[in-house]
């Protein structure tokens, strides 16, 4: 019985340490995360911070603050996704790269292709890659993606309609 209690004590001590304390004994969970001050981005040990950073980046992108949003996404790119899909992260990275003041079409295309390599039916990446192909004078490739988008999302979807209207 003593052995069992000792084992339980050791396991509970180990688990509580790994659940959110740093080497100084301070809790890293809760509202006061240092991830926003860390140039490397959120810690891979704190999935909540990764999710918060991802959604913060999305909000910045929606507010057309593309460079700021992209920087955050780059900081969490290598982290394990929590509350989102990696394909979505790459889709937003592509969108922000393409929409910023000085668009980086090469990076944007690579991000969209990464998203599609993870999810070949990613509707956002299909639409936005089609827009990129149109913007870079590759209309045949854009039309090919329009056809694929029609199959995956349907011709009545907003994504299909937006790309269709751009091409016609």
Each PLM stretch: what is its role?
Residues 63, 100-102, 136:
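Structural motif corresponding to the intra-repeat A-B loop/turn of tetratricopeptide repeats
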Residues 78-81, 113-117, 151:
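Conserved structural position within tetratricopeptide repeats
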């Amino acid at each position: 019985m003593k052995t069992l209690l000792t084992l339980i004590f050791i396991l509970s001590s180990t688990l509580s340490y790994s659940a959110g304390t740093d080497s100084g004994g301070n809790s890293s969970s809760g509202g006061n995360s240092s991830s926003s001050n860390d140039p490397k981005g959120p810690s891979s040990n704190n999935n909540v911070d990764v999710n918060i950073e991802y959604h913060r980046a999305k909000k910045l992108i929606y507010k057309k603050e593309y460079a700021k949003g992209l920087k955050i996404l780059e900081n969490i790119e290598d982290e394990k996704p929590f509350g989102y899909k990696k394909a979505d992260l790459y889709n937003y990275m592509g969108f922000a790269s393409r929409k910023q003041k000085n668009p980086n079409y090469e990076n944007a295309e690579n991000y969209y292709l990464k998203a599609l390599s993870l999810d070949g039916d990613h509707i956002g990446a299909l639409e936005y890659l089609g827009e990129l192909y149109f913007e870079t004078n590759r209309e045949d490739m854009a039309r090919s993606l329009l056809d694929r988008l029609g199959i995956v999302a349907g011709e009545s979807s907003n994504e299909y309609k937006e790309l269709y209207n751009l091409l016609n």
